[in-house]
């Protein structure tokens, strides 16, 4: 029966994998719903306050670029050629071979440069043209050949197009997507969890599918009770920090994190899914690797280490078991549980796996940095070639003996190794860190320039264009079955109680890596969600027009911000009422949908603007004169933050203004009229945006 369950789990998992690769959007069991277009008023202010509404910030984001591109192609005729030119250059930069780049560069030059020069309509500088021409004449086609044009195209976008984009509906759509991104609160319900694929000291790893996009991931679940029992809180939190440091930027050689979240019982990391097993497993199945095969793995691992070290992260646990293969045979470094940030302080701790730890790591009280990883790389490459660590000969398992040999033994390299390989390993396994390869001041660049890698095109490595020496079997789960992986004994943690103080440790644990979420959305549901939202918004706009509803009430007024909130403020009312609010320098107005604003609250009536909590939801509390109160609830975190800030700012400025207004004897004053005579012109107006 257990065998049948294992087979069914494998079949379900493999089917989910195949469907996810073919049509991930079709596998989505939840829908992403974009907020109303009116969210723009709040989100624009929220993003502006954080310096996010600039050309560089928006253009560098995947969804920002896609929407900017769509605006140029469909709504701005004069920008269309610039976008097409930019796209062609980006295609050129991704080409593998010099032959392909030669053909493509000539095509781009003829179509976008020479053609414009002949028609005297070339909009770019003479220096950019000469830069490209001179290299083409010398038959030089580096990947950055057109970089001067990229810079000038972006400058044109910045000067001529960006402001028009900000005023367009495409920027509104960008605000809608950013609101979704900044309000992600993941739970287990956001994933379909499949079979177990691994187990560690604190928990298990499962294959899973994200419900709203259909994308497959690995879910690493750590048990909070087990963490507490083993006093592993610092390790668990450190792994989350290290993953957040290395999971940005383009690096296909690290198992990166897209999300982190927690439940009352578990910490969960959502990671890249690797289906090809690990190098330790393949070494045992395949036998030792040849020099050329090892060079392939070494090159990809070196780029992974370079990415980590550029972020001041030392890995400290490099070994074949931590190198995972994807379904095509390319590798990624996994499990950053022992990684360490050395940007502010160098570590001293002796951590890692015996037989791979550098001498400076083993020596007590000695500080080290990325040097530790280059020594470990030498140990690992030796194992791929010989089947054992250079300091674990005769299958000794005595950790003290292995450490002693690491600190004292001169490594003997077989005569069968090529001179280039011997030189590489001697450099990496040098016990004196000041003479070790990779530790002489230039880091990974020293290793990449070693003669052993002379024939390697590192751009080809980065683009994963070299054929892997070993391709994992397709249609198989390259992991032990659930029975062999085993499970934790629940009795171990039966007496462990999680207190509020334990949960407080994980208060800041949840995280979404923006660029990875945007890439996931772009690859799966972006077009579908946009099309459905366009259709719904067009239908609603037509209906409002037919009913004669006013949708530009704030336009031309000194409205600071507007948008939907839910309110609860009537002593006889215990239900939330959704209303549309307008914040002015002297008052807060609101209305039900389709109605003219009919209710208002002046700043003179308000005593304080505070934050409160209603049933685990943060809300805004307005205390009103006469002991009354007014509670506002927002649909998303950014809205709550921005409404609270703007209400406090307006309230404070209104109070300062009221204090400056001389008290008029024997004459009652209307707070609305009196304040509206002196608008706070220094505050920005949303102008109906």
UniProtKB/Swiss-Prot annotation:
Positions bound to ATP: 197-205, 220
Regulation: In contrast to other AGC family kinases, the catalytic activity is solely regulated by the binding of substrates and ligands, not by phosphorylation of the kinase domain.
Residues in Protein kinase domain copies: 191-453
GO molecular function per UniProt: ATP binding; beta-adrenergic receptor kinase activity; Edg-2 lysophosphatidic acid receptor binding; G protein-coupled receptor kinase activity
Phosphoserine modifications at: 670
One Pfam match: Pkinase
GO BP of this protein: desensitization of G protein-coupled receptor signaling pathway; G protein-coupled receptor signaling pathway; negative regulation of relaxation of smooth muscle; regulation of the force of heart contraction
Active site: 317 (proton acceptor)
Reactions this protein catalyses: [beta-adrenergic receptor] + ATP = [beta-adrenergic receptor]-phosphate + ADP + H(+)
Chain positions covered by the region annotation Disordered: 665-689
PROSITE patterns: AGC_KINASE_CTER, PH_DOMAIN, PROTEIN_KINASE_ATP, PROTEIN_KINASE_DOM, PROTEIN_KINASE_ST, RGS
RGS domain location: 54-175
Site (Required for receptor phosphorylation): 3-4, 10
UniProt domain PH: residue ranges: 558-652
Gene3D superfamilies: Phosphorylase Kinase, domain 1, Pleckstrin-homology domain (PH domain)/Phosphotyrosine-binding domain (PTB), Regulator of G-protein Signalling 4, domain 2, Transferase(Phosphotransferase) domain 1
GO cellular component terms attached to this protein's record: cell projection; cytoplasm; plasma membrane; postsynapse; presynapse
Subcellular location per the Swiss-Prot or TrEMBL entry: Cytoplasm; Cell membrane; Postsynapse; Presynapse
UniProt keywords, alphabetically: ATP-binding, Cell membrane, Cell projection, Cytoplasm, Kinase, Membrane, Nucleotide-binding, Phosphoprotein, Serine/threonine-protein kinase, Synapse, Transferase
Protein function: Specifically phosphorylates the agonist-occupied form of the beta-adrenergic and closely related receptors, probably inducing a desensitization of them. Does not act on HTR1B/5-hydroxytryptamine 1B receptor. Key regulator of LPAR1 signaling. Competes with RALA for binding to LPAR1 thus affecting the signaling properties of the receptor. Desensitizes LPAR1 and LPAR2 in a phosphorylation-independent manner. Inhibits relaxation of airway smooth muscle in response to blue light.
Domains: entry comment: The PH domain binds anionic phospholipids and helps recruiting ADRBK1 from the cytoplasm to plasma membrane close to activated receptors. It mediates binding to G protein beta and gamma subunits, competing with G-alpha subunits and other G-betagamma effectors.
Quaternary structure annotation from Swiss-Prot or TrEMBL: Interacts with the heterodimer formed by GNB1 and GNG2. Interacts with GIT1. Interacts with, and phosphorylates chemokine-stimulated CCR5. Interacts with ARRB1. Interacts with LPAR1 and LPAR2. Interacts with RALA in response to LPAR1 activation. ADRBK1 and RALA mutually inhibit each other's binding to LPAR1. Interacts with ADRB2.
Protein name: Beta-adrenergic receptor kinase 1
């Amino acid at each position: 029966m257990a065998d049948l369950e294992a087979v069914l789990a494998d079949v379900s998992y493999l089917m989910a994998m195949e469907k996810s690769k073919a049509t991930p959007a079709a596998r989505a069991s939840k829908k992403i719903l974009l907020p109303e277009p009116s969210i723009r008023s709040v989100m624009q202010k929220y993003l502006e306050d954080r310096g996010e509404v600039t050309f560089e910030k928006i253009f560098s984001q995947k969804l920002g670029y896609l929407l900017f591109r769509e605006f140029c192609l469909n709504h701005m005729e004069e920008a269309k050629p610039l976008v097409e030119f930019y796209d062609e250059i980006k295609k050129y930069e991704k080409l593998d071979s010099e032959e392909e780049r030669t053909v493509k560069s000539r095509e781009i030059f003829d179509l976008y440069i020479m053609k414009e020069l002949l028609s005297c309509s070339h909009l770019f500088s003479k220096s950019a043209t000469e830069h490209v021409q001179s290299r083409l004449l010398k038959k030089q086609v580096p990947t950055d050949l057109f970089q001067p044009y990229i810079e000038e195209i972006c400058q044109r976008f910045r000067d001529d197009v960006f402001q028009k984009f900000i005023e367009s509906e495409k920027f509104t759509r960008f605000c809608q997507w950013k609101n979704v991104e900044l309000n992600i609160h993941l739970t287990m319900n956001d994933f379909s969890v499949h079979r177990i694929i691994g187990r560690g000291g604190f928990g298990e790893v499962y294959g899973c599918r994200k419900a709203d996009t259909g994308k497959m991931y690995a879910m690493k679940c750590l048990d909070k009770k087990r963490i507490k029992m083993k006093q592993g809180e610092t390790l668990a939190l450190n792994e989350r920090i290290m993953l957040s440091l290395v999971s940005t930027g383009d690096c296909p050689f690290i198992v990166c994190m897209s999300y982190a979240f927690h439940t009352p019982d578990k910490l969960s990391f959502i990671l890249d899914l690797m289906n090809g097993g690990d190098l330790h497993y393949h070494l045992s199945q395949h036998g030792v690797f040849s020099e050329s095969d090892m060079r392939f793995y070494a090159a990809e691992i070196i780029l992974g280490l370079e990415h980590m070290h550029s972020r001041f992260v030392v890995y400290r646990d490099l070994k074949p078991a931590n190198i995972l293969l994807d379904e095509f045979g390319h590798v990624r470094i996994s499990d950053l549980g022992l990684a360490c940030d050395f940007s502010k302080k160098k570590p001293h701790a002796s951590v890692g796996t015996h037989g791979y730890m550098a001498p400076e790591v083993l020596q007590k009280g000695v500080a080290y940095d990325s040097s530790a990883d280059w020594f470990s790389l030498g140990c690992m490459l030796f194992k791929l070639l010989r089947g054992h660590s250079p300091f674990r000969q005769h299958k000794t398992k005595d950790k003290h003996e292995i450490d002693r040999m690491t600190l004292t033994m001169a490594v003997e390299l077989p005569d069968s190794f090529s001179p280039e390989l011997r030189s590489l390993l001697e450099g990496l396994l040098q016990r004196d860190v000041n003479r070790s390869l990779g530790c002489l001041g230039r880091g990974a660049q020293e290793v990449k320039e070693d003669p052993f890698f002379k024939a390697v095109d590192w751009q080809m490595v980065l683009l994963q264009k070299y054929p892997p020496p070993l391709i994992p079997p397709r249609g198989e789960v390259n992991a032990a079955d659930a029975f062999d992986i085993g499970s934790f004994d629940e009795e171990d943690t039966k007496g462990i109680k999680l207190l509020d103080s334990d949960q407080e440790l994980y208060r800041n644990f949840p995280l979404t890596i923006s660029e990875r979420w945007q890439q996931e959305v772009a690859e799966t549901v972006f077009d579908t969600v946009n099309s459905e939202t366009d259709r719904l918004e067009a239908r609603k706009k037509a209906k409002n027009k037919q009913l004669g509803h006013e949708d530009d009430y704030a336009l031309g007024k000194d409205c600071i911000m507007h948008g939907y909130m839910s309110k609860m403020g009537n002593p006889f009312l215990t239900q939330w009422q959704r209303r549309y609010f307008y914040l002015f320098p002297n008052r807060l107005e609101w209305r039900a949908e389709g109605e003219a604003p009919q209710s208002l609250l002046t700043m003179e009536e308000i005593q304080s603007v505070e934050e409160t909590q209603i049933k685990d939801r943060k809300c805004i509390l307005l205390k009103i004169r006469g002991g009354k109160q007014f509670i506002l609830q927002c649909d998303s975190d950014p809205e709550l933050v921005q409404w609270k800030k703007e209400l406090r700012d307006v309230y404070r400025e209104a109070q300062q203004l009221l204090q400056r207004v001389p008290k008029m004897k024997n004459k009652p004053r209307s707070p609305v009229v009196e304040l509206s005579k002196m608008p706070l012109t220094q505050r920005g107006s949303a102008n109906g945006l």
